[in-house]
């Protein structure tokens, strides 16, 4: 089979490079936004630009990857990231020119400047071309067997976490030079360029990126128009509603949405909780997330590889969601000890649940529609990210640590849906 002939490691390297470039800049994005005239709310809007525009770009790029090939669309996505960092670099080099002073009851007081607009454009452009996640998931589904799928998605998550480990560390080293934050941005530009070169020269095209055609319409130049027409006719039918009608897809994507909703509530509320209730500083918070990333590398790497050969994706999804519920419940007690105990549950829960869910989605979807379905899943996660990022801060302001109980309740919905997902699978002939 073609599955065994293509190495996954070039794709993992491309994913690592993409995450590394992003995590180089995110640690000091808040300081740049404030320096260019923004406030905390504008920072939140800046951070949400990526998922807002990915909401529209992800499904389109996913469908295109079914039609034109995974490699071509991954290349477009990576070029988009490269251009977005160029725009970001321009924002840091141009003078801070004021456009208008804004005093709003909703957005607060801030100054709209030219560099601030450039940063908004950069994050939006990266989002609209941000189909790399959905296309990478579809690519892995093309080249791996069902038996190895969960383990392979775990390795993809490991490459992501490694990027988030090394990126902030490298940013810290580069930003203390005389060039300040501009050097990490230049590094992000160069790293994105390396990603482009790796896709061009090291990543082969997936052998399963288009629909399985009958032999009589493959081959000659005269027949190429028939092939193209057939690809278009089938792919054009795979709109949002058609994908939602596929058996089992809506339930799986609902789980996607709920997981990312709970995650983003956590990632918004926890730093405030750590600063106000645990009395942590930036170094303590950085240590916490570094330990989490290291634990995730272990869980999603060797541990998941071992357990996925012994237990089903459905069992790992269900048990993982239960562990994440325990993580959020422990956070309510606001002690350092229980917070770090909860960290273990977070790593185990996320490490078992997320790769298993991606594996289930890829196995539920026919090969010819992997890109389209993965693209729609990106929209679900983007929408959940937008809602969670906005709601998390407001909820913590009103409910305090009870916000984590709300996140646990959301994940209890994931737990119930995963039980039904397993039952529906058993009922299939």
Language-model regions, residue ranges each:
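Juxtamembrane intracellular "pre-TM" segments in multi-pass secondary transporters
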Residues: 1-5, 206-253
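Helix-to-loop junctions at the C-terminal end of transmembrane segments
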Residues: 58-69, 299-312, 396
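C-terminal ends and interior cores of transmembrane alpha-helices
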Residues: 79-112, 322-334
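C-terminal transmembrane helical hairpin of 12-TM major facilitator-type secondary transporters
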Residues: 314-357
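Hydrophobic core of transmembrane alpha-helices in multi-pass small-molecule transporters
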Residues: 16, 84, 98-131, 338-352
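Short amphipathic helix-loop junctions that connect adjacent transmembrane helices
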Residues: 27-41, 268-284
